[in-house]
Amino acid sequence: MTGSSSQFQQLEKLGEGTYATVYKGRNRATGALVALKEISLDSEEGTPSTAIREISLMKELDHENIVTLYDVIHTENKLTLVFEYMDKDLKKYMEVHGQQSALDLKVVKSFMFQLLKGIMFCHDNRVLHRDLKPQNLLINNKGELKLGDFGLARAFGIPFNTFSNEVVTLWYRAPDVLLGSRAYTTSIDIWSAGCIFAEMCTGKPLFPGTANEDQLIKIFRLMGTPNERTWPGISQYTNYKNNWQIFVPQDLRLIVPNLDSMGLNLLQSLLQMRPESRITARQALQHPWFHEITMPNAVPQHLSDPYQQQQQQQQHPHQPIIDQQY
């Protein structure tokens, strides 16, 4: 798996992250474009744990909607991960191809389907991504979407893990994580997917919070302020307050006006406040909104009311792989 840096010609810089710089590169032997993720190594501290985690996860995750890790080059002061080259991230794609960053619904449907397939593969392999956002979703010129940057991902084979709650860019962070949950499930990636879904439709982030508390308030303004009746056990969270302003849930049709009722039903299922009420990636892929992709010759189905979630949740309860520990 370990190659030599002389195999690759470094081209322009593509971006800089918390622990790595990414360059466009070319395989000298084949001429194929690659992305070179360079991580500087501190001689005293050695390879960062984030990088080791990313490498071990990426090697295991072989799927059409997950960026392929081709090679790992380890030198004394540098670690280079060689990934398949993708043309742009979703954020850039929306800026270039969107109408004021909002995408055509056919494109949104294709990208959501691919995103959920990538998420389902991760979850089936007991991996949480934990940092899904438009900047971490990569698009190539064939219109394929792939999950990238597993720097914060963590395999969750051991039940009752207490994870650090310093994950996921604020805007895409699930309310249970914001409230201080340290033992969460696949449902945190589902919330992020819902936020990305709405953003692709409107061109604007759904919950652009400035800090943890502000992020919660922005969610409550739209989804309603939760309480023990609507979310049993919420008062046990570390960051819970019993004096939050009371907001009533808003009609999502007003927030995402260009989305049809079936799409709104899916969005509502992804953005359930209680983690155990959120739909799973597998259930989401079977949602009628995707039938033109999954069953192109079938008769269209219609849901009676996109806001009647209770009945749907009783039929398809979210089954977390890790038990929720509060």
From Swiss-Prot:
<dbReference type="GO" id="GO:0005935">
    <property type="term" value="C:cellular bud neck"/>
</dbReference>
<dbReference type="GO" id="GO:0031648">
    <property type="term" value="P:protein destabilization"/>
</dbReference>
<dbReference type="GO" id="GO:0000082">
    <property type="term" value="P:G1/S transition of mitotic cell cycle"/>
</dbReference>
<keyword id="KW-0547">Nucleotide-binding</keyword>
<dbReference type="InterPro" id="IPR008271">
    <property type="entry name" value="Ser/Thr_kinase_AS"/>
</dbReference>
<dbReference type="InterPro" id="IPR050108">
    <property type="entry name" value="CDK"/>
</dbReference>
<feature type="region of interest" description="Disordered">
    <location>
        <begin position="300"/>
        <end position="326"/>
    </location>
</feature>
<dbReference type="GO" id="GO:0005634">
    <property type="term" value="C:nucleus"/>
</dbReference>
<comment type="function">
    <text>When phosphate concentrations are high it phosphorylates the PHO4 transcription factor thus establishing repression.</text>
</comment>
<keyword id="KW-0723">Serine/threonine-protein kinase</keyword>
<dbReference type="GO" id="GO:0016242">
    <property type="term" value="P:negative regulation of macroautophagy"/>
</dbReference>
<dbReference type="GO" id="GO:1901987">
    <property type="term" value="P:regulation of cell cycle phase transition"/>
</dbReference>
<feature type="binding site">
    <location>
        <position position="37"/>
    </location>
    <ligand>
        <name>ATP</name>
    </ligand>
</feature>
<feature type="compositionally biased region" description="Low complexity">
    <location>
        <begin position="305"/>
        <end position="326"/>
    </location>
</feature>
<comment type="subunit">
    <text>Interacts with a number of cyclins.</text>
</comment>
<protein>
    <recommendedName>
        <fullName>Negative regulator of the PHO system</fullName>
        <ecNumber>2.7.11.22</ecNumber>
    </recommendedName>
</protein>
<dbReference type="GO" id="GO:0032880">
    <property type="term" value="P:regulation of protein localization"/>
</dbReference>
<dbReference type="GO" id="GO:0016239">
    <property type="term" value="P:positive regulation of macroautophagy"/>
</dbReference>
<dbReference type="GO" id="GO:0051302">
    <property type="term" value="P:regulation of cell division"/>
</dbReference>
<comment type="similarity">
    <text>Belongs to the protein kinase superfamily. CMGC Ser/Thr protein kinase family. CDC2/CDKX subfamily.</text>
</comment>
<dbReference type="GO" id="GO:0005737">
    <property type="term" value="C:cytoplasm"/>
</dbReference>
<keyword id="KW-0067">ATP-binding</keyword>
<feature type="active site" description="Proton acceptor">
    <location>
        <position position="131"/>
    </location>
</feature>
<dbReference type="GO" id="GO:0071073">
    <property type="term" value="P:positive regulation of phospholipid biosynthetic process"/>
</dbReference>
<dbReference type="GO" id="GO:0055088">
    <property type="term" value="P:lipid homeostasis"/>
</dbReference>
<dbReference type="Pfam" id="PF00069">
    <property type="entry name" value="Pkinase"/>
</dbReference>
<dbReference type="GO" id="GO:0004693">
    <property type="term" value="F:cyclin-dependent protein serine/threonine kinase activity"/>
</dbReference>
<keyword id="KW-0808">Transferase</keyword>
<dbReference type="GO" id="GO:0045719">
    <property type="term" value="P:negative regulation of glycogen biosynthetic process"/>
</dbReference>
<dbReference type="GO" id="GO:0046822">
    <property type="term" value="P:regulation of nucleocytoplasmic transport"/>
</dbReference>
<dbReference type="InterPro" id="IPR017441">
    <property type="entry name" value="Protein_kinase_ATP_BS"/>
</dbReference>
<dbReference type="GO" id="GO:0006974">
    <property type="term" value="P:DNA damage response"/>
</dbReference>
<dbReference type="InterPro" id="IPR011009">
    <property type="entry name" value="Kinase-like_dom_sf"/>
</dbReference>
<dbReference type="GO" id="GO:0030447">
    <property type="term" value="P:filamentous growth"/>
</dbReference>
<dbReference type="InterPro" id="IPR000719">
    <property type="entry name" value="Prot_kinase_dom"/>
</dbReference>
<dbReference type="GO" id="GO:0050849">
    <property type="term" value="P:negative regulation of calcium-mediated signaling"/>
</dbReference>
<dbReference type="GO" id="GO:0000122">
    <property type="term" value="P:negative regulation of transcription by RNA polymerase II"/>
</dbReference>
<dbReference type="GO" id="GO:0005524">
    <property type="term" value="F:ATP binding"/>
</dbReference>
<dbReference type="GO" id="GO:1990860">
    <property type="term" value="C:Pho85-Pho80 CDK-cyclin complex"/>
</dbReference>
<feature type="binding site">
    <location>
        <begin position="14"/>
        <end position="22"/>
    </location>
    <ligand>
        <name>ATP</name>
    </ligand>
</feature>
<feature type="domain" description="Protein kinase">
    <location>
        <begin position="8"/>
        <end position="290"/>
    </location>
</feature>
<keyword id="KW-0418">Kinase</keyword>
